[in-house]
Amino acid sequence: MNGMNDLSLDRIVEILAAKGREGEYWDYKQEWHENMADLLKDIICFANTPHDANCYLLFGIDDDGHIVGMQKSRRKQADILEAMDNLWFIGDVKPEISVETVVINETEVDVLTVYDTQKTPIYLKRNYGEMLAGCIYMRNGDKNTPNRGMASIDDVEKLWKKRFGLLQTPLEYIVGRLQYQTEWKQQDHTYYNMYR
């Protein structure tokens, strides 16, 4: 999956659909979730991954990777963002998402991108739907943590290591910090970057 973030969205959909199976970075959904709580749980699980790549919920693709389109009503990005704004996240850190529609072989596929973040783990202060406050839900392989469960201690440790840059080599960490110029502050004739 390395380098996938640099491809066009329609090319990403074609590649992931051709795999014919779900994975750590993507999930097929023939239709949008009827229950917003289930959709938000999927988003939180995809935000909590130890890798450094964006994740994708692909709507209009069946479980075997066939592009079939959608028959039922679709969700709007604004509605999803509003629902996330109503959740109570620890540290007020929310997943960043976007929703776009691509056309593959004359069939529309909605793509919900969950952008990679170093600010893991992301979890709730209060119960929501079947999700429990303080529980860390994540994507592991092609499965999400169960509603009433919690990620394993080893997986939670990886998420904290990701937050503190401990899963990268020192060079990767430094290059990563240099890329985010908006986080650099000027003081007199020098610049500094404080970890957030």
Where are these regions (language model features)?
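Conserved N-terminal catalytic/coupling substructures associated with nucleotide/phosphate chemistry
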Residues: 1-196
